[in-house]
Amino acid sequence: MAKDKDQNSIFAITKNLTITCFISGIIIAAVYYITSPVAAQKQVQIQNDTMRVLVNDADKFNKVNGKKDWYAAQKGNKTIAYVVPAESKGYGGAIELLVAVTPDGKVIDFSIVSHNETPGLGANASKDSFRGQFKDKKADALTVVKDKSNTKNIQAMTGATITSKAVTKGVKEAVEQVTTFTGGK
């Protein structure tokens, strides 16, 4: 008799656990279904805001046909920049960027979309003091150096050389892609 009671309690526990998991799964799926459109809309809003900050002269941003996640920044009917995604491997993993580049291949600015770099070191790559070095530079000048007297290239951040090189590599690749796409004009 004790054996039957133990088996019944095991089945009862299993049944209750299965029902609980099933109900939890339904609740999670319902919350995801309700919130995913809002999250997607918020992501688009963040990207649009970032593009406006990168190219504040633009009237509108149009998707570039044949290029995934590329946008042409338009002022009037003229393309004044391209906003291009880039990714590079930093000290803490992937660094995702949005890079604004002129049609003739000069960096306007960039924004770090996501990273896992060390706070206080690699995370400083998003600060104006580092980002400002990239302004108006073409691909050939996008090399990291540790010589403070060299203003032609990108000065590495102290304690974050790997991050400096990763961000510079990502920006350089974006510039090269735009230059290839436009023919440098």
Swiss-Prot record:
Pfam family, one: FMN_bind
Intracellular or extracellular location(s): Cell membrane
Keyword Phosphoprotein: yes
Top-level taxon of origin: Bacteria
EC number, UniProt record: 7.1.1.-
SMART domains in the cross-refs: FMN_bind
Required co-factors: FMN
One GO term describing the cellular component: plasma membrane
InterPro entries, sorted: FMN-bd, Ion_transpt_RnfG/RsxG
Keywords: Cell membrane, Electron transport, Flavoprotein, FMN, Membrane, NAD, Phosphoprotein, Translocase, Transmembrane, Transmembrane helix, Transport
Biological process terms in GO annotation: electron transport chain
Disulfide pairings: none
Transmembrane annotation, as ranges: 14-34
Keyword Zinc appears in the UniProt entry: no
Modified residues (FMN phosphoryl threonine): 161
Bilayer topology annotation: Single-pass membrane protein
Main subcellular localisation: membrane
GO MF annotation, one: FMN binding
Function, in words: Part of a membrane-bound complex that couples electron transfer with translocation of ions across the membrane. Couples electron transfer from reduced ferredoxin to NAD(+) with translocation of H(+) out of the cell. Essential for energy conservation during autotrophic growth. Contributes to ATP synthesis during heterotrophic growth.
Family: Belongs to the RnfG family.
NCBIfam families to which the protein is assigned, alphabetical: rnfG
Oligomer and partners: The complex is composed of six subunits: RnfA, RnfB, RnfC, RnfD, RnfE and RnfG.
UniProt protein name: Proton-translocating ferredoxin:NAD(+) oxidoreductase complex subunit G
